[in-house]
Amino acid sequence: KLTWLGDRFRMLNADVLAVQEVWDDAALKGALGRSGLRYDFVAVPGAENDATHGGAQGTPQVGIATRLKVEAMQSFAEFPPGFQVDVPGLGLHTRFERPPLVATLRMKHGQSLTVLTAHLKSKRPKFLQDAQGNPTEDRDDRKVMALASLRSLIMRGAAAMPLRCL
């Protein structure tokens, strides 16, 4: 898999790679290494894998790899004030499931470039579950399925709203 990804990265030969579905920054760095290309900056906030972190927990993260100079980078876990939304059965939705990443880069001829890397919640229904991850709803019930689909739609829309204001 790392070799396959490395081949894709080499074919792109991009100055900036915005990535999603990263569970482990070491794996991304490994794929970049297999590309044979040099990326001076690689970051996947929340998916660090080192002595104190064990990669992403619960959901994959987004990241960036670039050859350009990085002037600023920020990951946003919380929605900005005023963007919280009530989700039926879950309560107030106040956080991004996969925090978006905003990076300000300096291009080779001096222009400033802002890159937003985001991965919104899937359209897959959001069923209620207990603290251990066990379902607390009958997934075969059409009403439950409809409500779970509504939850997903609300959460996806709630995450899309503040992206316009970051």
Where are these regions (language model features)?
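Active-site regions of metal-assisted phosphoester/phosphodiester hydrolases
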Residues: K1-L2, R67-L166
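N-terminal, active-site-proximal structural segment of metallo-dependent hydrolase catalytic domains
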Residues: K1-R38, A43-P60, N134-D141, M155, ...
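Residue-level detector of short, conserved catalytic/binding motifs and their immediate flanks
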Residues: D15, P60-G63, L101, L113
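A SAM-dependent methyltransferase catalytic signature shared across enzymes that methylate proteins
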Residues: S35-F41, T66-M73
